[in-house]
A protein has these predicted regions:
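N-terminal secretory/targeting leader peptides
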Residues: 31-124, 132-341
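Short, low-complexity disordered leader/linker segments with a strong preference
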Residues: 1-36, 341
Length: 341
């Protein structure tokens, strides 16, 4: 009898224990894992792009309650410049930047505003770029990309070891370029284009591999180009150079709806797009004043030389139209319409 009582007590204990276990919270084998997207950029760690992307990332972490993070990788530390577009196209990067500097046949039609001498200021470029948003959205969607934000670099100038004041001064000069259009206009103006990744510009100027480098004047200080080039030639080859922040569409579709909304809210609350254009204009103005302090000489070609260069560069537009087909033609028409021409 005693044995039966003990057995009954033991069974009761086991039943209670089992029930308690069922009521206890299940061990969190793996709490919902934080979704991490890596965002590569060619911009230096202190450059406004990097600062703005980090602010956007911080806002996203806040909006998602820590469920999603974007980690910014500056100064080509994740992928070199020419790899940025392929990386987001093939999904190695769920989020990335499409730089006008690296547009290829894959997305060349995105660049009507990047044609040589199309715009002459950041303000003019911005006005047209924002009107072209539906066109950009459509072109990116064709390649499996979702447009998040239209951003910009400042105007494109020439760092050089000798002054380039006239069209004649371009003759025979080896100029670092960053894509098909900049290569074409350099050739038309009499120079020899050399494709060099952004991260290699400093050493190319230092070793005299090139006589000059086409890029934004605002890179003088953060990239220390002032150490290896003594002249900044203000040819305004482009009033600005766009950078589109995009997501790989498959990666985007894989996000829960609330996280998609968190991304859009973070873009809005960080004011990323507007901040980019404001910072570009401020950086350009600040750089112009700063260059002499860095020991650089500013070269302003005459109006006559600029007009001559623009006329010569028109041939580059024809080449671009031939390569981009109907989409390019439509994009150019939209760009000219937006600019009131």
């Amino acid at each position: 009898m005693k044995k039966l009582a003990c057995l009954s007590l033991a069974l009761t204990f086991l039943a209670v224990a089992a029930g308690g276990a069922a009521l206890a919270p299940a061990p969190v084998a793996a709490q919902a894992k934080t979704i991490v997207w890596n965002l590569p950029t060619v911009a230096a760690p202190t450059y406004y792009h990097t600062v703005n992307y980090n602010a956007f990332a911080a806002k996203l972490k806040e909006k998602s309650g820590g469920r999603m993070e974007i980690r910014v990788h500056p100064a080509s530390s994740l992928y070199p410049g020419p790899e940025l577009i392929p990386a987001v196209l093939d999904g190695r990067s769920a989020v990335g930047t499409v730089l006008a500097s690296y547009l290829t046949d894959v997305l060349l039609e995105m660049g009507p505003l990047e044609l040589p001498f199309m715009t002459s200021s950041i303000e003019e470029h911005k006005k047209a770029a924002l009107q072209l948003r539906p066109f950009y959205t459509e072109m990116l969607a064709k390649k499996g990309l979702k447009l998040l934000s239209i951003n910009t670099w400042p105007s494109q100038q020439i760092f050089s070891s000798v002054p380039i004041r006239t069209v004649a001064d371009w003759k025979g000069k080896k100029i670092r370029v960053y894509g098909a259009d900049s290569a074409n206009v350099t050739r038309l103006l009499g120079g020899s284009p050399v494709n060099i990744a952004f991260g290699e510009v400093y050493s190319a100027l230092e070793k005299k591999t090139v006589d000059g480098a086409m890029t934004s004047a605002t890179n003088a200080e953060p990239m220390k180009f002032f150490e290896v080039a003594k002249f900044l030639d203000y040819w305004y080859l482009a009033g600005a150079a766009q950078e589109w922040l995009v997501a790989n569409q498959k990666a985007w579709d894989g996000l829960p709806k609330d996280l998609q909304q968190a991304v859009m809210d973070a873009l809005k609350d960080s004011n990323l797009e507007e901040k980019e254009w404001q910072d570009a204009a401020a950086a350009e103005e600040r750089t112009r004043k700063r260059l002499p302090e860095l020991g650089m000489t500013i070269v302003d070609p005459s109006k006559e030389e600029m007009a001559k260069a623009r006329q010569i560069a028109k041939a580059a537009w024809d080449t671009w139209l031939q390569r981009t087909g109907p989409d390019g033609k439509r994009g150019l028409e939209l760009a000219l319409q937006a600019l009131g021409r």
